[in-house]
Amino acid sequence: ASWGVTGNQSLNDDSALGLGISAYYPYTDMYTIRNVNDEASFVFNRKGNKDLTWEKTQNVNVGVEFDIAGIVEGEVDYFNRLTSDMLFLRSTALSQGYASIPVNDGKMRNAGVEFSLTAHAVKTKDVSLDIRLNGSHYKNSIVELPMDGESGNRMDFYQYTSRFTWVKGGSIYDFYIPTYKGVDPETGYALYKTLNAVDAAGNVLQENVTDVELYKKNHKSEQYSLVEGTPTSDWTKAASDFVGKSATPKLTGGFGFDLRVKDFSLSTTFTYSLGGYAYDYVYA
């Protein structure tokens, strides 16, 4: 068993920083040299944060090793990693002269099991054959979302990309997209799920709710239900919501064998990934 704390100081959100390189100095204001009216000029690039600290990860590991008659040996480990003071780019009002500032905020947990097995299938003077197998299963969950720079409260959700949205208790790799409902037999276009907000009497409050988490945030004090409407081929009217699919595989690992015949040896290694979903941008 072991316990420890590791740090991370890398803030590498290139798209948000607009630098095209890693943010090596997130604690200080940065400027770039540009041509302005044919004159070399220093131009403000991004805002730093002098109070920024290391991102911290607490690691807990518990494992067991075993050997069965020298034929099968292996190891099983349980790990639990809680990351706090996460490095995050908090959006700010553009009137301040910059769009975001790096801060320490949010918590995330990764917990799971890793194993490795080796079977000594053949073991003689001239021939030996070892078969190897290892794997890992883990669950990623968001413990605490960052603060909202405008309201001063914890975020209800955070849209990480156009396909992934973060909520407390969910994974950073949970798909948040419109639900596919088949093909329109008349046009051949793909159909997607729509949602309408209705009150207790069945009156429609809003047709075509396109972002479920955003609607929940903006209508917390209201009583309503989201009712499925007629499928649409218009992507702009489709309802984006969690579809119960994750990009995280259920099990990943590798396998292979080591063969020796006198002075000749052969080793192979293969990798595998079971479960998890991928989004096809070409056919979507």
Residue ranges and their predicted role:
Residues A1-V167:
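Extracellular/periplasmic, surface-exposed regions of secreted and cell-surface proteins
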Residues G63, Y180, G256:
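Short, surface-exposed charged micro-motifs
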Residues F44-N45, A238, P249-K250:
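Flexible glycine/proline-enriched surface loops and loop-helix/loop-strand junctions
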Residues S128-D130, S246-L274:
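Conserved C-terminal beta-signal and adjacent last beta-strands/turns
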Residues S273-A284:
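Extracytoplasmic gating/loop element in the C-terminal half of outer-membrane beta-barrel translocons
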